[in-house]
Amino acid sequence: MITLLVVAGIALLIAIGYMNHVVENNKLEKARTKIELNDRLRRCGELTETFPGQLMTPALKLLITRLEINVCQRLLNLEKTNTAVKARLDELNALAAQGESIPVNNPPAPIQTEAKAKDVRFLLEALHGQITRAAQDGFLPPNEAKRWIREVRHILVLLHIEFFNNLGQHALQQEQPGQARLAFERGVQYLRKQQEPQVYAEQLDYLEKLLARANAMVLASTQPVE
């Protein structure tokens, strides 16, 4: 009898220890998930507020709004009394209900420096990550997620086109044809390396003409004066 009581006591202690372990693991997992969701919420906010207006379309604005809705809903499941998240979710749902008539108030932010181009690349990387996570959550259908991943790559190309063009044009204004030639040459090489260069045939032709113009100016400046 005593042996049975001892065995039962040991089993009870093991069960209690296991339950405590499960409870602690659940708490840790919940805390980890909250940290991750708050980070995703912050990134969505950065995308909404700081993405350059010349690259933001109503469709993209709607996508970012939907991505933030997904994160808010998941966060609210963990913090049901979070009034700030509830209020933000109501605001986002009202915006999403407008479809592609959603207002786009992002001001244009010309890409004129390496630092600015790098900042926007980071935003695009964040957007790529948010799309991937939303697909993993089951919020975005796989086909839609793939389509938006392609669109992110397209926007990245547009970013480089604008950057190399602005860099070259600025150099021309400063009467630095050598620097302009280098910028336009970088743009031409970048477009030629794209998997589907024909998509950017018009932009490539434009940059090639600017490159030829800058090259002619460099050659003219190196001609000996008679």
Regions found by a protein language model. Give the residues of each.
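N-terminal signal-anchor transmembrane alpha helix of single-pass membrane proteins
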Residues: 1-37
